[in-house]
Amino acid sequence: MDSSYWENLLLTINRFLGVYPSGRVGVLRWLHTLWSLFLLMYIWTGSIVKCLEFTVEIPTIEKLLYLMEFPGNMATIAILVYYAVLNRPLAHGAELQIERIITGLKGKAKRLVYKRHGQRTLHLMATTLVFHGLCVLVDVVNYDFEFWTTWSSNSVYNLPGLMMSLGVLQYAQPVHFLWLVMDQMRMCLKELKLLQRPPQGSTKLDACYESAFAVLVDAGGGSALMIEEMRYTCNLIEQVHSQFLLRFGLYLVLNLLNSLVSICVELYLIFNFFETPLWEESVLLVYRLLWLAMHGGRIWFILSVNEQILEQKCNLCQLLNELEVCSSRLQRTINRFLLQLQRSIDQPLEACGIVTLDTRSLGGFIGVLMAIVIFLIQIGLGNKSLMGVALNRSNWVYV
């Protein structure tokens, strides 16, 4: 099936959930705007009601961290709806720029990029929908198939969760397109490197044989021209990536913070469960583990997507250094390209100038995470010591 089919299907799901601009004009666009605002107000209302109805007696800091998920969800969904309603020209412009970059590829390379992107789109879309469908199923079982209770729970948990996951894909998919283009550059440089070497088994007349062979390959300056085109394309990729990060920066930062707080709370509650387990709550434990996997997966996915671009830049630098320099023009072109790549590597992109988006930042996230979880555990142990009895287990059952 054509790769664009899966891309269009994913965009249709995003539009239906009100987190991607409508591709229509006139009345249909206004209807989409009203639908997006309705979903936003529905989630906001449900989240506010959930906060007001939360009356479980637990330590204040624990209650604060637990309830922080709701305003976090409300803020991130509001940003996505804002993008969908008012940021349509920017989204359309970014799509055109990516198409412009891909148009510069040769026919076979272009088809390969679209094919690989279509396969990834199908994989991510299926994984996201199946995972959130499983969360809905566990929620239904947890509430003993009570329709309205399950409907209310899914409205404030799984619906915003699905919308935020799709929002992350809105950023990750175009960045993956850029990565695929850079991967094509890597393969072209690898082919050029092989072309510059004489066939295996050839008799070497002298020490300069390989250089002389490379001169024949570069006859007419074709190698220098190809590398110069790659340098220009890399510059465009850098600009487009920066534009996407500027557009999604605030959303990514809020998403990372929201996921970090949620992971802290879920880890603490799972610790409480295994401290004094009640196996009739095992379904809720599964729900906690799924929620933990979702938030942890989001943090890793956001950071790893950007690190792939960084890795490709390093691969390009390595291949450029391995090329046989056979003319002053080729040498100048390679040096300019290397300088551009090195400058880009030394200045990694940051979301809102706060979070460096690569997996090296993961150590900081883990450090903060463990500090908060240990702090919560110490509070719980301190309360038990003061009271002389175990805390009421009602702090486990609040979903």
Swiss-Prot record:
Keywords: Cell membrane, Glycoprotein, Membrane, Receptor, Transducer, Transmembrane, Transmembrane helix. Residues 1-33, 87-120, 228-250, 304-361 are cytoplasmic. InterPro entries: 7TM_chemorcpt. GO terms for molecular function: ligand-gated monoatomic ion channel activity; taste receptor activity. The keyword Nucleotide-binding does not apply. It is a multi-pass membrane protein. Expressed in the adult labellar chemosensory neurons. In larvae, is expressed in neurons of the terminal external chemosensory organ. The keyword Cell membrane applies. It is found in: Cell membrane. GO terms for biological process: chemosensory behavior; detection of chemical stimulus involved in sensory perception of taste; male courtship behavior; monoatomic ion transmembrane transport; signal transduction. The chain crosses the membrane at residues 34-54, 66-86, 121-141, 207-227, 251-271, 283-303, 362-382. Glycans are attached at residues 383, 392. One of its GO terms (cellular component) is dendrite. Residues 55-65, 142-206, 272-282, 383-399 are extracellular. Probable gustatory receptor which mediates acceptance or avoidance behavior, depending on its substrates. Belongs to the insect chemoreceptor superfamily. Gustatory receptor (GR) family. Gr10a subfamily. This is Putative gustatory receptor 59e. It comes from Drosophila melanogaster (Fruit fly). The gene is Gr59e.
